[in-house]
Amino acid sequence: MKIFVGCSDAFASKLAPTLDLCTTQNSHSKRDPLWERACSRRGRQLHFTFCALLVMSLTACTVGPDFKKPEAQQISEWSKPHNAAASQAVAQDMDERWWEVFRDPQLTALTQRALTDNLDLKLASSRLQQSRAARQVITAERYPNTAATGSYGRKRNSGEGLSDPSGHDGNSAFNLWDAGFSASWELDFWGRVRRETEAADATLEVAENDQRGVLLSVLAETAQDYIQLRGVQNTRAVTEQNLDVARHSLKLSQLRLADGVATDLDVAEAAAQVAAIESRLPALEQRQAQLINALSLLMGEPPQALHAELSTDAPVPQTPRQVAIGLPSQLAERRPDIRQAEARLHAATANIGVAKGDFYPRITLSGNLGSQAMQLSDYGSWGSRAFGIGPQLSLPLFDGGRLRGVLNLREAQQQEAAIAYQHTVLRAWHEIDDQLSAYNASQLRRDSLAEAVRQNQIALRTAQQQYVEGVVDFVNVLTVQGELLATQQQWVESSTGVSLAMVGLYKALGGGWESVYPISVQR
């Protein structure tokens, strides 16, 4: 007798094994007519029950709201500055490997090492693996659970207790051999398990975008630390150049003092200027060491591991004439934090369905098939057969409001996730607008400081010549020299700031993870 007679062959082949309980005949036993009639009657009942349950399972609804991608505030175009600088942001496809637009081989090499060896990225990958394992645990509920069992024991029952099923009435011990298979499967009529799987998928997407967000931070921090390092080295070079000028002025004042055309005050002021400039160098050396250590940490290396590689001076990486930043409509798909907020909202929506599913009855199909005998020679015979099959139903009746409280909690969490999504999108627009403004303003400041440096250089040469001619005193030379040093350092800092602003812009745009953790292969 086949369990699924009356159901479609597809149902029978896909959803459960075919059991021939009533047509199996042991070679050493005869059929029992009473058993066959009982089996036939029970078989028809099982046919009806199984087919009804399976049809209900396959046509079941899914409780709870379906997730719809939220609509957030959008802008049609990027903001444009009133006074545009030389390098402009353009709405063209953004380079996925944006750090290469600096055309600095050292920066490109360091970035590649960070992608491979950074410990924060490895931690994020570990968290992603945990999320995948958690999803596997949850999705396993969609499938039947099967197990094989087997046992042997020697027993003796009490002769003074309840009826002894062994037939020995407690007079002697007996053996018991038992083995078989068992299976159970929760029929997901209301879609509770499907909603759990949906929430697990969304939670996994949260972890995926968390990894992308960590990657984006590592990329930006590597570029920022490297650019700052080159900026500090250029500032030190400018300081050393000014130190040479100050020493030359000191030597000049000493010669003039020997000739009787200068005073001790001129020499003292020149010496003080030399000492003041020299005092700036230790702080710059310390800052260089800190930045090299910061890069070493990003590479997963011990302190000073990159000192020999990075201690040699190099120019600050320069920005290109045009910076491709993509279209505003691409932002939601590119920024990991927006994708993460959307996934959290998706998971919160699915969890409402899980909470609603708990109000409905749970129906589980369970069964077992095996053999049990007190003599090993009887094990496997027709008379040793044992089986059980049927549905189990669990329906919550009274729980003191716990289920209602859980549902209210899930709905409130969904509202929070929806607001968080809107806030994340709005914050992204503000960050990009601020970075666009900062990128343009930093260029204008750099260009103005470049002109200030040029004019101060002219002023210093003029002051030195006039001092030699006796037209002005040495205070004028020191004043102009101090102004030149200040403007030169400000120019180096502003030039560094332009490159840092571009890194901040790319970080705000959310680009850089596509080529490392693409969507199509990550899961």
Regions found by a protein language model. Give the residues of each.
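Bacterial Sec-pathway N-terminal export signals of envelope proteins
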Residues: 62-135, 316-346, 396-397, 422-425, ...
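Small/polar, glycine/serine/threonine/aspartate-rich low-complexity segments that form flexible
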Residues: 86-89, 93-102, 151-182, 305-324, ...
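Short, low-complexity intrinsically disordered segments enriched in A/P/G/S/L with frequent Arg
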Residues: 16, 31-46
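Periplasmic alpha-helical coiled-coil/stalk elements that build and connect Gram-negative outer-membrane
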Residues: 62, 193, 202, 209-327, ...
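Alpha-helical hairpins and coiled-coil heptad-repeat segments
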Residues: 250-267, 459-477
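Acidic, low-complexity, intrinsically disordered peripheral segments
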Residues: 302-303, 317-319, 323, 469, ...
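Sec/SRP-type N-terminal targeting helices
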Residues: 122-123, 139, 187-215, 265, ...
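Amphipathic alpha-helical coiled-coil scaffold segments and their short linker/junction regions
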Residues: 88-92, 100, 115, 137, ...
